[in-house]
Amino acid sequence: MTHQTHACHMVNPSPWPLTGALSGLLMTSGLIMWFHFNSTTLLMLGLTTNMLTMYQWWRDVIRESTFQGHHTPNVQKGLRYGMILFIISEVLFFTGFFWAFYHSSLAPTPELGGCWPPTGIHPLNPLEVPLLNTSVLLASGVSITWAHHSLMEGNRNHMLQALFITIALGVYFTLLQASEYYEAPFTISDGVYGSTFFVATGFHGLHVIIGSTFLIVCFFRQLKFHFTSSHHFGFEAAAWYWHFVDVVWLFLYVSIYWWGS
């Protein structure tokens, strides 16, 4: 039997990177098939294999960290750096959308009517559903902080209550955003305004759905006593991600909904 004399986690060979890459190929190919041939078969296959890969890969990570004790303080430090770099990459991702928006709105071309919003576009009222959405996300930021502090203090019931409230607010935000899209007087094909609006807010909405899923997993893990007051990086990463989603929305609200209208 070999003995490990270092604090690093030497990961066992895994099929999930390969199946993840193949499912990504299927999804992107499926998107092209959907756009050009109106066939969703390949896309659904890609999504299904992607979901199965994520479930099994994260199941393995939970097993290694919670039940096998491989996530030493040294490993957790590396995971924290990884999460920070991931969030930085997401910031740069959204920077591109803001750049496109400000490039188009600060110096509107004659094709847009020389004004912003472009001629013929009726923007959404920033003091109606968008303001409610802002309040909902800010409240969820407070409740996720409450959950984090409750976890660090060992108060299990308060942590579960606060986490449930955060998830409920995240789902409520998604439903509000969907209703707003349904009732919007413009579409993604309405020039540069429609493109920048729906791509920026749509990708943010996707991040809210991902963040809500992340928190739901944390909720069930907490029910199974996976987290302790000193060992809960999975939840900590979800909280960081949720705060990032909050901050991006504030920039979206001020830029696109309020100033841009």
Swiss-Prot record:
EC number(s) recorded for this UniProt protein: 7.1.1.9
Principal EC category: translocase
Main location as per UniProt: mitochondrion
Record keywords: Membrane, Mitochondrion, Mitochondrion inner membrane, Translocase, Transmembrane, Transmembrane helix
Catalyzed reaction equations: 4 Fe(II)-[cytochrome c] + O2 + 8 H(+)(in) = 4 Fe(III)-[cytochrome c] + 2 H2O + 4 H(+)(out)
BP terms from Gene Ontology: mitochondrial electron transport, cytochrome c to oxygen; respiratory chain complex IV assembly
CDD domains: Cyt_c_Oxidase_III
Complex formation: Component of the cytochrome c oxidase (complex IV, CIV), a multisubunit enzyme composed of 14 subunits. The complex is composed of a catalytic core of 3 subunits MT-CO1, MT-CO2 and MT-CO3, encoded in the mitochondrial DNA, and 11 supernumerary subunits COX4I, COX5A, COX5B, COX6A, COX6B, COX6C, COX7A, COX7B, COX7C, COX8 and NDUFA4, which are encoded in the nuclear genome.
Name of the protein in its database record: Cytochrome c oxidase subunit 3
Species this protein is from: Gazella saudiya
Taxon lineage: Eukaryota, Metazoa, Chordata, Craniata, Vertebrata
